[in-house]
Design a protein with these regions (language model features):
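Bacterial N-terminal signal peptides that target proteins for export
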Residues: 1-7
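Formylglycine-dependent sulfatase
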Residues: 22-377
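Short, low-complexity interaction segments enriched in Ser/Thr/Pro/Gly
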Residues: 1, 18-23
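Hydrophobic h-region of N-terminal signal peptides that target proteins for export
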Residues: 10-19
Length: 377
């Protein structure tokens, strides 16, 4: 049997062959299902979509399966997650905007109890169900201590009503975050099931931690006599831009040529890859007309792009770990793999987006100068 992979852009589906024989065939031969969701991944951020970023594992899946060129999404962010989990339009699922209660039908900020999740359906039909990663479909009102935790760890008992946690919406287990944005080295709202994780070990990086957990669970599922459904939702490459030094080093010179050169090179590769067949026209003008050579923060921006690339690189490395675990345990040939992003790349922190200096060195989003200690207390 062929395994099936789907990369959705961002989207993709693939067929490959496992080198390992199934170790102890299960009596229930329905396919395992692995859904992998990236966060704010751009259309051209993968090698198989023209990127200079090193993504060999996802590129291999794309080559073996189906790569989508016209995969559209009617929502974004947490509304995407609500739709993906329920098969409903985001308003029907209860999250028409974000995870804040606007006190309007369709805008309650929490996954509706009337919306059945795919995990609930598959669990009822005999699947083992697991979630690893970012939830972001439960109302998480910001309290002062939570805001402080984004910069400095302050323990808080719960991050939304427990009835809305993944383990109470069809998942047998969940390791990951409830909230939508975290410090990658000290993540806010990290839980194991319903229990907050108070401390993380030295050298912790959430992207790697999620990959490690997913690979471990894949190996454990090989011992069970039923298929599994795993929803792996990475936080990367959503801001804040935080990556491991060894990954950043790979790209420290890549983006010094500037965004125009990178954009044009990606487009040329996309044409060569057949993503835009028969199109010889030039790219449309960029939304912002500032030229790289006139950019006073070129060094800063080149570094930021390098960190962004490093975050994606680490996601791909993790997916390689998971594929290896599937192959080693003889499960790859009977696993459906889907990879997609909740939306395209984020433009929230671009210079001049709102007529002010956004995300510049030592500046706030409204252009005010800030001074703060570089080390977390």
């Amino acid at each position: 049997m062929n395994s099936k992979f789907l990369l959705l852009p961002t989207a993709l589906m693939v067929a490959g062959h496992s080198a390992a024989e199934a170790k102890g065939k299960k009596s229930d031969q329905r396919p395992n299902i692995l859904v992998i969701l990236a966060d704010d991944l751009g259309y051209s951020d993968l090698g198989c979509y023209g990127s200079e970023i090193h993504t060999p594992n996802l590129d291999k899946l794309a080559k073996q399966g189906v790569r989508f060129n016209h995969f559209y999404n009617t929502s974004r962010s947490c509304p995407t997650r609500a739709s993906l989990l329920t098969g409903l339009y985001q308003h029907q699922a209860g999250i028409g905007r974000m995870t804040f209660d606007d006190h309007l039908p369709g805008y309650r900020g929490t996954l509706s109890r009337n919306a059945v999740t795919i995990a609930e359906v598959l669990k009822e039909s005999g699947y083992a169900t697991s979630m690893v990663g970012k939830w972001h479909v439960a109302e998480t009102p910001l309290r002062k201590d939570q805001r402080e935790w984004l910069a400095h760890h302050v323990f808080h008992d719960t991050f939304s009503d427990l009835c809305h946690y993944p383990v109470n919406r069809g998942f047998d287990s969940h390791y990951g975050i409830i909230y939508g944005v975290v410090d990658y080295f000290d993540p806010f709202s990290l839980v194991e099931g319903e229990v907050p994780v108070k401390e993380v070990p030295e050298g912790y990086y959430i992207t790697q931690a999620l990959s490690d957990r997913a690979a471990k669970e894949v190996e454990e599922y090989a011992k069970e006599d039923k298929p599994f459904f795993m929803y792996l939702a990475y936080t990367a490459p959503h801001w804040p831009l935080q990556a491991l030094p060894e990954d950043i080093k790979k790209y420290e010179d890549t983006y010094k040529v500037g965004w125009e050169a990178i954009r044009n090179a990606r487009y040329e590769r996309q044409k060569q890859l057949g993503i835009f067949p028969g199109m010889d026209n030039f790219l449309s003008e960029r939304q912002f007309h500032d030229k790289w050579e006139d950019n006073p923060h070129a060094e800063w921006d080149a570094r930021a792009m390098a960190v962004h690339a490093a975050m994606i690189d680490r996601v791909d490395q993790g997916i390689g770990q998971i594929i290896e675990a599937l192959e080693k345990t003889g499960q790859l040939d009977n696993t459906l793999i889907l990879f997609l992003s909740d939306n395209g790349c984020s433009n929230e922190d671009c210079q001049n987006m709102s007529g002010r200096e956004n995300d510049r060195p030592d500046m706030t989003r409204d252009g005010k100068k800030i001074i703060y200690p570089r080390n977390k207390q």
